[in-house]
Amino acid sequence: MADNEPLIQPDRGQDAISLHLVNRDGFPEWVKKLSTTQRTALEAQKFEGSGYQVGIVPDGDSWFAVGGVANPAELSSWCMAKLAEALPAGTYRRAEGEPGPAVHGWQTAQYVFDRYKQPERPVGPRVLLTKDVGAIDNAIAEAKAVCLVRDLVNTPAEDMGPAALEAQCEELAKAHS
């Protein structure tokens, strides 16, 4: 998770790539709205609307993404995580509806443990926009907490002894007191 740029930001109408969420049952009806070229692109990617599938669809000089989820009307914490992993860096917004609890998986899917080695080909942040501005701060805090725990778990014991754990606890206490 990037420290310098929040991965969840307020939707103020800025440019963003559309994310369409479909399920396997609703996909046949949804795909009828697309052009032949767009349907062919999804067929080439073997996209059927199954959970955690990601498709890229050409749209004139641009494109949009489609993700398979269990229920587009009731998103879970993890249903958009695969999109955050698979899509290129950029700014995204749901085409219909708000991401709701899926902001958690969107953020934590971008976690990279890079304390000892930098990624060979780092991927920039995938920012998700939401109109639910009141939920952003809590969602970011929760994702940061998860990523901190992942860092602690991924740090070898030789670098995370009692003194290092104490220092981490002191840092947290100072930040939140």
Enumerate the predicted regions with their spans.
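N-terminal hydrophobic/helix-forming segments and targeting peptides
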Residues: 1-177
